[in-house]
Amino acid sequence: MTYSDLLLFIQPFSPPEQWLQRVRQANPAMRVEYHHVEMYAKELPPISKETWAEATILFTWQLFPPKEWVPKLQYIQLLSAGCNQLLGMPLFEDTDIAFCTSNGNHPPQIAEWVFSTFLAFQHHIPEYLENQRARKWVDPPTDEDTEDAVGLRIGILGYGCIGRQCARVAKAFGMDVYAYTLHSRDTPESRRSEDYTEPGLGDPEGEFPSAWFAGKEQLNEFLASDLDLLVITLPLTNQTRGIISGEQFDILSKKKAYISNVGRGPCISTEDLMAALDEGKIRGAALDVTDPEPLPANHKLWGYKNVIITPHCSGNSNHYYERVLKIFAYNLERRAQGRPLVNHVNKALGY
């Protein structure tokens, strides 16, 4: 049989037979080659230059060939939702190759992380765990020492697929949702999501927010809108680096918001964050990402009792690969049908 497509599957896991059957049904003329790599491998697996020259599709995470090796490459599916690892790469910036993220894979588990850490803070769970380890029964000083989530306002900085799932969970807790996007979404059509969304999850129609904000000119207005919880889900670009800094912490101090960062560490100025914590401008923070990352053992940020830090693991799930493969198969089917790919990275914007 003559094959019109060659897919190089470069991952730490092999493609399941059921998945292969699905994609071959969509495109019988596609050949799939699996090449194993360790999760954090730094070098490409041994693949001949002849094979690279024939490849039309690549499934990878952080390993990429030089653009000169892949004259026929048309589509790269990333294992990750973020794509800042591509910035400055000629394969990304100087070609017409379509890059697609795995947006839609992470929202369930990351939204769970956001609310498990926020509710743990609200309900004093870290303190109770310390008491438990010390075998101490310490009664709360009052029955009103806990603020539940009903009626609180969550501001979601970056209303993509992760932010939309956070909104869904927030609404279930009875919270009010405000959304901020980098670009204006002032019509019902513009508020619809173009990313892959699992049925029954997220906010594909953009129905949950009671207020929308957009652009640099409305950032501080958004932060000044009496937010109880600020969730940052932004990618890292030149526009978003340091988007929450000293001026923004001053604004957030009005309500003493709690901050949750599941985007990228450099979206927050670490020095300004620590100053805000020292001065009591915010109630606390939950950080799955930091700047620097990994956070050095002697870093001051470790020492705050009102800060929860985890090692960039909020996206971990035993359904991770299953969901990524579902997104990838969906895109391969759309490609075979001549339809636009979902989660297509905008090279001009960098996400």
What would you call each of these model-derived segments?
Residues Y178:
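Conserved beta-strand positions in the Rossmann-like core of class I SAM-dependent methyltransferases
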Residues L129-Q165:
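Glycine-rich NAD(P)-binding loop of Rossmann-like domains
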Residues S184-K300:
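Rossmann-like adenosine-cofactor binding region
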Residues P66-L73, M89-T95, F249-K255, A276-K281, ...:
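Short, conserved loop/helix-junction motifs that constitute active-site signature segments
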Residues R22, C100, G104-W113, E127, ...:
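C-terminal helix-to-coil terminal segments
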Residues Q62, S80, I232-L234, V262-G263, ...:
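Glycine-rich, N-terminal phosphate-binding loop of Rossmann-like dinucleotide-binding domains
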Residues W52-R133, D143-E147:
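Phosphate/diphosphate ligand-binding glycine-rich loop within oxidoreductases
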Residues M1-A55:
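N-terminal glycine-/charge-rich "phosphate-binding" loop or analogous flexible N-terminal tail
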